[in-house]
Each structure stands twice: as structure tokens, then as C-alpha cells.
UniProtKB/Swiss-Prot annotation:
NDH-1 shuttles electrons from NADH, via FMN and iron-sulfur (Fe-S) centers, to quinones in the respiratory chain. The immediate electron acceptor for the enzyme in this species is believed to be ubiquinone. Couples the redox reaction to proton translocation (for every two electrons transferred, four hydrogen ions are translocated across the cytoplasmic membrane), and thus conserves the redox energy in a proton gradient. Belongs to the complex I subunit 4L family. The keyword Transmembrane applies. GO terms for cellular component: NADH dehydrogenase complex; plasma membrane. It is an enzyme of class 7 (translocase). Pfam families: Oxidored_q2. It comes from Aquifex aeolicus (strain VF5). This is NADH-quinone oxidoreductase subunit K 1. Coiled coil: none annotated. The gene is nuoK1.
Amino acid sequence: MDIIKAYIILSIALFLIGLLGVIVRKNLITVLVSTELMLNGINLALVAADKVLGRVDGQIFAFFVLTVAAAEVAVGLGLIVAIFRLKGYEASHEISQLRD
């Protein structure tokens, strides 16, 4: 098996595991980690496709996605902490609206 195909299969597996975590889990922190897993799967696919094409565009875009993901984690974790302090729990199925 070609190494690029293995990278693409791994990236699809990472994305699907992350998607399953977003759909199944109710803990907000686990959903946030699953979202990051999905983004890492996309990044791996971008870098693998970039290796096939022999360009650096995919690597630059993957770096940009990592930067945006870091900001997403900071904002998401801040919201989760605020919800936990306000409501006393962090389960996503029990929080239906942000306003009281």
C-alpha cells in the first residue's frame, strides 16, 4: 500500500472518530476534543494531498487551520467554564439556551 493512501485512510478514520464523538457524547469538553480530532484529520489529509501534488499550499492551509483551532479551543473552553459556573453542570443536552 502506498504511504499516501495510508495517510488518507488514517485522516478519514480520525475525522470519523471525531464525528462520532461529537454526535454521541454529551460532555462539552469531550465534544470540543472530538472537534479538534476532526480538524486534525482534515489537516492530515491536506498535508498528504500536498505531498502528492508537490506543493506547499496544503501545509500552509493546515498551519492556518491549527491557528484557528487554537483560538476555537480558547473561546470554547472559556464558554464551557462560564456555563459551568452559571449552571453548575456542563452536559450539552441540558443546556438549551445561553440566556436565562
